[in-house]
């Protein structure tokens, strides 16, 4: 959730990491050291990600760019099965555990789109992931 990313960003900054935010300009207001949301083209975005120490985010175009350049990172998944998106051994993922509905996006009839309809009505796949789980995985990536 947006609040979790804000807490995560603050924790990374406390540890001395520089947080650069990329993506669309309507994304959440996560605090960052350099805010490039809505300010880069594909070439500029690629340059920023290619030179990053690590990528942290969701299943998105920037995550795929990070994998293309073999940038280590952590990606957070909910309704999408990570095995359909992760191609780099350096990209780790975090998802809620023990939910029968994980990967529900792939069980929807065509045309399969990311819709706000959740089988549990509570988006457990996102809400059950804790900031501590996220931070633990990020620290593993940063230390490797």
Where are these regions (language model features)?
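Donor-binding and catalytic core of enzymes assembling or modifying cell-surface/extracellular glycoconjugates
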Residues: 1-83
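Nucleotide-sugar donor-binding patch of glycosyltransferase catalytic domains
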Residues: 35-36, 67-143
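Short, flexible coil/linker elements and helix-boundary hinge sites characteristic
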Residues: 16, 143-144
């Amino acid at each position: 959730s947006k609040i979790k990313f804000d807490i995560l960003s603050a924790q990374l900054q406390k540890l001395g990491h520089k947080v650069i935010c990329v993506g669309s300009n309507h994304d959440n207001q996560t605090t960052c050291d350099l805010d490039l949301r809505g300010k880069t083209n594909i070439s500029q975005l690629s340059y920023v990600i290619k030179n990053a120490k690590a990528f942290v985010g969701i299943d998105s175009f920037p995550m795929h760019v990070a994998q293309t350049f073999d940038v280590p990172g952590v990606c957070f998944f909910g309704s999408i099965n990570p095995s359909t998106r992760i191609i780099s051994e350096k990209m780790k993922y975090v998802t809620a555990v023990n939910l029968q509905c994980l990967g529900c996006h792939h069980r929807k009839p065509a045309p399969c789109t990311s819709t706000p309809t959740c089988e549990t009505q509570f988006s457990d796949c996102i809400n059950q992931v804790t900031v501590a789980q996220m931070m633990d995985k990020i620290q593993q990536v940063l230390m490797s």
